[in-house]
A protein has these predicted regions:
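N-terminal secretory signal peptides that target proteins for export/translocation
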Residues: 1-4
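Aromatic-residue-lined binding/catalytic grooves and analogous aromatic/hydrophobic interfacial grooves
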Residues: 23-340
């Protein structure tokens, strides 16, 4: 009888401990992010997003792993580099380290190219932000989902985010318990040369990265060189669905207006023309336009729950292979926000 009780206790602990462990896997904050370093980050291996969790204006900044400056190198940029090796060795033997450091530039090629940001989705809430309380935002590392939530006039508002690898899309869901719903403007901007248009509840953005750039420490007035006929190109799609309210396409400024919806779904997809390190991204680039349109079509054909479940299942297949035990933490300490 005693052994049976012990068995049931152990069995219960087996199911309870993962729940406790999962709760402790959250990065939790009680105010919106002000700087990049304070933002929460999600990604699917191709696209990444930083989440600021703003109340009046929420920003979600995106990048793409293939959005770099540069083009394929057609020749050896330093064919005579080997001639500098004896000089560098001699300078080192004479302990002339400054001279050796200067001489080693002769064996280097061009400056490496740089990563470039894709752009930022801004959700500007047009409602009065007075009466907001109980603000929380978190990233659950256990299932790679993030949330911002707070009370407004005693009614719960939530923003949920995840970056799906199976469906190659970033998904955002806004929900409000307020019967008047959500009233907001959505826009997408990029620091790169680009054009935007809106149609059928979708913002479409096309642009291109620099074909060459210098490091940030390089003294030059123009560190980035752009040409629409060169460099990696991209297309970003932002699709919006209002479950029970209205969606208006603002053609004049390429924005989307949401009004009176208690639930809004947003999908973000991006594809670049990168087709390999040795392929010209314009002349031999991938058909990024058709790829991103197909990707979006597939994603919006699935329910939010189906996308989320597939994402979590895929993520946990890899993440749950390892667990790190850092010991016990007092409950009052564990309840504190991460930055406290």
């Amino acid at each position: 009888m005693v052994m049976k009780k012990v068995f049931w206790i152990i069995l219960c602990m087996f199911f309870i401990l993962p729940v406790i462990f999962a709760e402790n896997m959250k990065l939790h904050y009680e105010r919106p992010a002000e700087y990049f370093e304070e933002a929460l980050v999600i990604g699917n291996g191709t696209m990444g997003a930083t989440l600021y969790g703003g109340v009046k204006k929420d920003k979600i900044s995106f990048n793409d792993i293939t959005l770099w400056t540069g083009e394929p190198e057609s020749e050896n940029s330093s064919p005579d580099a080997f001639n500098a090796i004896p000089e560098i060795r001699a300078l080192l033997d004479n302990e002339d380290y400054q001279g050796a450091d200067k001489a080693q530039y002769k064996v280097q090629g061009h400056y490496s190219e740089n990563y470039q940001p894709l752009g930022t989705l801004t959700i500007e809430y047009l409602d009065d932000t007075a009466g907001i309380s109980d603000y929380h935002r978190w990233l659950d590392i256990g299932n790679a989902t993030a949330r911002t939530q707070y009370l407004k006039g005693g009614k719960l508002f939530t923003s949920d985010y995840f970056a799906s690898a199976p469906d190659s899309v970033i998904v955002i869901r806004l929900k409000s318990e307020n019967k008047e719903g959500i009233h907001a403007l959505l826009s997408f901007d990029s620091p790169l040369p680009h054009s935007s248009q809106v149609a059928d509840n979708e913002i479409s953005v096309e642009g291109y990265a620099a074909y060459h750039s210098f490091p940030v420490y390089y003294k030059a007035e123009d560190k980035h060189r752009y040409d629409p006929e060169r460099g990696i190109h991209f297309k970003t799609l932002v699709r919006v669905l209002s479950v029970d309210g209205s969606v208006k396409n603002r053609y004049s400024d390429s924005r989307i207006e949401i009004d009176g919806s208690t639930e809004v779904l947003i999908w973000v997809a991006n594809v670049t023309s990168f087709n390999g390190f040795d392929k010209d991204p314009v002349k031999e680039g991938r058909n990024y336009r058709s790829h991103v349109e197909k990707r979006m079509k597939c994603a919006i054909g699935k329910t939010y729950d189906a996308l989320r479940e597939a994402h979590i299942r895929d993520y946990k297949y890899y993440f749950d292979r390892v667990k790190l035990d850092l010991g016990d933490t007092d409950d009052d300490i564990a309840a504190l926000p991460t930055d406290k």
